[in-house]
Design a protein with these regions (language model features):
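Inter-helical loop and helix-membrane interface segments of multi-pass membrane transporters/permeases
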Residues: 2-5, 40-60, 73-133, 162-189, ...
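Select transmembrane alpha-helical segments in multipass membrane proteins
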Residues: 8-13, 52-66, 114-120, 180-192, ...
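C-terminal membrane-solvent junction of multi-pass transporters and transport-like membrane proteins
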Residues: 57-64, 308-319, 354-415, 427-431
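Helix-loop-helix connectors at the membrane interface of multi-pass transporters/channels
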Residues: 42, 76-108, 211-216, 221-233, ...
Length: 456
């Protein structure tokens, strides 16, 4: 996204949001999980005061997890496929047009995309089926070590390319004029969405991991470690991609075009490009699979907490459901390409991404914050007690009003601005309809936070 939104100026705003918004929300999610020892299926039920309505967020949370995986499993499948394709030399000797055609051919092939999506789903649920200690902890730890090793090797190689320093300058020196040209609102919303997305906050995915945390460490310290690691991986990924693009005179952009068209073109021009390309997509595969496994664990835990299922049954049922639910995103590039839900040029994946990234992640974060700091939910005293339990950094005691008023206000303003920026070019009628939708979604969130419920 740094390439799309002007490089260092975007990164600076992203880091600000990460500290001021992302970190406090992550602490809130961890606190809810650790205090309840449950997923979002039951966490709010157990912690909310009598008559509160926060437990209804559990449904919104699970919808978010499913919708996210309905397209992310497909994207993770692309990563695995390209790791294989680069290693097997499928892209060797292809010019720019042929590389673009190769990616188009993948998207046109419903069978190939379905196969690799199924591989991702089965592999990830297989890890989760082993349980937390035997599967999740051991395998993700190995994956993270491999990921960090790969990212350092790839970044060092990228920085040694001729002309790479121009890319480093673009990446690390802010250009606010370029940001203004792109649109400050677009850049800010992109940075906000990225802060929520990279930390996986707002949908309840981190709540389940909070439920596995011990009481010996404070939650601010744990959250800070995760934020630093996440930021390191994100920034190092940029140091791999952007200097390499500048070294070979390729315009850095964003999205699938950058990863699956631009970068393979760069690798084709590079000495030993097949090896470096395979290593890059192996790194991307580890990164995407770690996200899939984390969200699948939340889905499994939700089913176990809500339905009382065994882990084995939760894995089998959700694996079958996920394969079926992921098919629309796959078919949206071929069989169902005529469906353009957000206007011309969009597809089913764009709609699913919009639902999660532009709606549930930011607004879900507001729900977690209000639950932890307001009188309508769990409350500030309970939150601080849980967050500060254990050794390590203590949560600032004087930021309650900031979290109660400022964080929700910032998120809501940028949320509405994001709708406006996205749909205003499509005309007043379309804009009006979608702004009404945004207000209805806000109303739903307001009902969850402030509504009263006599029965659960």
């Amino acid at each position: 996204m740094a390439g799309k939104y002007g490089g260092a100026a975007f990164i600076l705003i992203y880091l600000i949001f990460l500290v001021l918004l992302g970190l406090p929300v992550l602490v809130c999610e961890f606190a809810v999980g650790r205090a309840s020892r449950k997923s979002t299926a039951r966490a709010f039920h157990d912690l909310e005061p009598e008559g509160a309505n926060f437990h209804n967020f559990s449904y919104m949370s699970m919808v978010s997890n499913y919708v996210l995986m309905m397209f992310y499993t497909m994207v993770a499948g692309w990563m695995l496929y390209y790791c294989y394709a680069m290693a097997a030399g499928k892209l060797d000797g292809k010019d720019s047009a042929q590389v673009a055609d190769y990616f188009t051919g993948l998207q046109d092939s419903a069978g190939t995309m379905t196969l690799w999506m199924i591989i991702v789903v089965v592999l990830s649920f297989g890890v989760c089926s082993l349980g937390v200690q035997r599967g999740l902890e051991k395998i993700t730890k190995v994956m993270m070590i491999c990921l960090l090793a790969l990212i350092v090797v790839l970044a060092v190689h990228s920085l040694t390319l001729d002309g790479a320093m121009e890319g480093v300058k673009f990446y690390l020196v802010p250009d606010f004029a370029a940001m203004a040209e792109i649109g400050i609102g677009n850049v800010i919303f992109g940075a906000l969405s990225q802060a929520f997305f990279t930390l996986s906050i707002g949908a309840g995915s981190m709540t389940i991991f909070g439920s596995y945390l011990g009481k010996d460490r404070s939650l601010l310290g744990e959250s800070l470690h995760i934020t630093i690691l996440d930021t390191f991986v994100a920034l190092m990924a940029g140091l791999i991609i952007i200097p390499a693009c500048f070294a070979f005179g390729v315009e850095p952009g964003a999205g699938p075009g950058l990863v699956f068209i631009t970068l393979p073109n760069v690798f084709n021009q590079m000495t030993g490009g097949k090896i470096w390309g395979a290593l890059f997509f192996l790194f991307m595969s580890f990164a995407s699979l770690s996200t899939v496994i984390a969200v699948f664990e939340n889905i499994i835990s939700y089913s176990m907490d809500r339905k009382g299922w065994s882990r084995g049954k939760a894995v089998i049922v959700n694996m079958a459901a996920m394969i079926l639910l992921s098919l629309p995103a796959v078919f949206g590039f071929n069989i169902l390409s005529g469906i353009q839900p957000l206007g011309a040029g969009t597809n089913i994946m764009d709609l699913e991404d919009f639902i999660v990234s532009n709606n549930i992640l930011p607004l879900g974060s507001v729900v977690f914050v209000m639950f932890c700091v307001s009188k309508y939910g769990w409350g500030w005293k309970n939150f601080i007690k849980e967050a500060d339990t254990g050794e390590g950094l203590k949560f600032p005691a004087n930021v309650q009003k900031y979290m109660l008023y400022v964080i929700p206000a910032i998120v809501v303003v940028i949320y509405l601005k994001g709708y406006y920026d996205m749909f205003s070019p499509k005309g007043p009628v379309v804009l009006t309809v979608w702004m009404i939708v945004s207000l209805l979604v806000l109303g739903l969130v307001g009902w969850i936070i402030f509504g009263k419920n006599k029965t659960k």
